[in-house]
Design a protein with these regions (language model features):
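Terminal catalytic/cofactor-binding subdomain
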Residues: 1-174, 182, 334, 338-347, ...
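Structured core elements
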Residues: 34, 187-189, 323-325
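A very general structural signal that marks isolated residues within well-ordered alpha-helical segments
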Residues: 39, 193-195, 211, 330, ...
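Long, well-ordered mid-to-C-terminal structural blocks that present hydrophobic/aromatic surfaces
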Residues: 283-366
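Loop-rich catalytic cores of soluble enzymes, especially ATP-dependent carboxylate-amine ligases
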Residues: 112, 134-141, 145-317
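Conserved phosphate-binding loops in nucleotide/dinucleotide-binding enzymes
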Residues: 117, 193, 197, 326-335, ...
């Protein structure tokens, strides 16, 4: 029988005392890409379809070629299989390539010491992925949500757990199936040195979350037209499942403690648990119910708690790390601004103290509005006295002041390109859409060409200050 004290011990187990010092502070980036391939039914070659789940021109073929190209450039990627199906790749250093439910391909990088290492691994991922889709004339697309295709046009992974989730989604939210099939995000994981450090960082980062959504919003197009949201991806997440997503009020409270996170997690239900090869669907049982013996065949164990935590999707998630999940995916040359900004804001104690003062001064009652406004308006958002553009510029300037040229290169480029002017990547996407006379396929071709240029620039021209 699992006891409550063991739930708290999980977080204690993963405290990293070395994280109090800069040399021990790691960065754990995750980066998702959408992929499209030419529509074989269109002889004009002007339209595309999402990457499928089968065959040489689908996910298995892309993974196989990724592995083969990696070997050509001295990278060893081992296949991960379910039965005979190749479902992912991993290397000995701890990085992995995984497939999300709608065929999104994700780099889950190993913990990194320096931003230059994050840039190098991201460059390798983008280069290898481009080579892997070249034989099928595929194109990478770094937008936070599929901009043209409806749900039926996007294949669902054959993994059974995804099918269980997919069938459950309409019961708990209006857009959960879109979340699974059509979204792509950027995530960053940070360490905590103690439970006190975890609690302090968590409450501050939860308050920071809406501003991260606004700064890095990059998904304004849905079903071929402007959605009314700068981050339609974040809007999707807000309408997925209130029991396991979002930012509960207790998370932003001045008095937040790890017990609040445990209580919240206990109220959520596991999608399923595996026992001796049999999958038990458990959506009608909260984790607390299961601990109290509500299911005759399930006696929950410590590993079930760990698995349950990974199937919760708040904007900021606590596991063995603090996982920041509020950002849309971005083009490769823009995405390095995410770890650069967060490393400076969270790991630099002087900057973090200033950030804490700024954020904890804001009224708790306004934060649900912040999240809604961030998704809709990006940096044009305002809630009472808080102007998102002004707040974002202050955040960026605080971070850049603390960084040397090497650390700040990618962030300063992003700042000068977007935030300084009160815009996000979504605004540039919308500009291109209107330039294309609001014709979705004309815009899509322009968007793909713009992304291709940025991808090639990123691969061939490292940030001039990178070490």
């Amino acid at each position: 029988m699992l006891h409550r004290k063991e739930l708290r011990q999980y977080f204690e187990l993963y405290c990293k005392p070395s994280a109090v010092d800069k040399k021990g502070q790691k960065l754990g980036p995750e980066y998702e890409s959408l992929i499209v391939i030419p529509d074989c039914n269109d002889i004009s070659g002007q339209t595309y379809v999402p990457l499928g789940m089968e065959g040489d021109d689908g996910v298995p073929g892309v993974l196989q070629r990724f592995q083969e190209f990696g070997q050509m450039v001295g990278e060893v990627w081992e296949g991960k299989y379910e039965g005979e199906n190749l479902v992912g790749l991993e290397n000995q250093e701890g990085a992995s390539i995984t497939i999300e439910p709608g065929g999104q391909i994700e780099l889950s990088d190993q913990p990194r010491d320096h931003l230059s290492q994050v840039e190098s691994s991201t460059r390798s991922f983008v280069r290898n992925l481009k080579e892997s889709i070249r034989p099928i004339e595929g194109r990478l697309m770094f937008l936070g949500a599929q901009p043209l295709f409806d749900l039926d046009s996007i294949s669902l992974s054959p993994k059974r757990r995804y099918h269980i989730m997919f069938q459950h989604m309409p019961e708990v939210g209006s857009l959960g199936q879109w979340m699974m099939k059509a979204t792509a995000g950027t995530q960053l994981s940070l360490d905590y040195s103690s439970l006190e450090d975890l609690e302090r960082k968590f409450r501050v980062i939860c308050r920071l979350s809406p501003f991260l959504t606004a700064i890095f919003s990059n998904s304004p197009i849905h079903l071929g037209k402007p959605s009314g949201y700068k981050s339609f991806r974040n809007h999707i997440w807000q309408n997925t499942d209130d029991s396991r997503c979002g930012i509960p009020d207790s998370f932003i409270s001045n008095n937040f403690q790890i017990e609040d996170y445990i209580d919240w997690a206990l109220r959520a239900s596991p999608y399923h648990l595996n026992r001796e090869g049999e999958i038990h669907e458990l959506m009608n049982h909260s984790f607390m119910d299961l601990m109290n013996g509500s299911h005759s065949q399930i006696n929950v164990e410590f590993k079930d708690w760990e698995n349950h935590l990974s199937m919760l999707f708040p904007e900021i998630r606590i596991k063995n790390i603090i996982e920041i999940r509020s950002m849309d995916t971005l083009t490769p040359e823009d995405v390095l601004a995410v770890p650069a900004l967060l490393q400076a804001l969270i790991y630099d104690e002087t900057v973090f103290g200033r950030l804490e003062s700024m954020l904890m001064d804001l009224p708790e009652t306004e934060f649900p509005w912040y999240q809604q406004v961030a998704a809709r308006d990006g940096l044009e958002g305002e809630v009472n006295r808080v102007k998102f553009r002004k707040f974002a510029v202050k955040l960026m300037e605080m971070a850049l002041e603390s960084m040397n040229l090497s650390e700040g290169c990618r962030l300063s480029v992003f700042f000068d390109r977007y935030t300084r002017h009160g815009i996000s990547p979504a605004d540039r996407v919308l500009e291109r859409f209107y330039t294309a006379d609001e014709n979705p396929w004309k815009w899509f071709q322009i968007e793909l060409e713009a992304e291709e240029e940025k991808q090639n620039s990123f691969i061939n021209y490292p940030c001039k200050h990178s070490e």
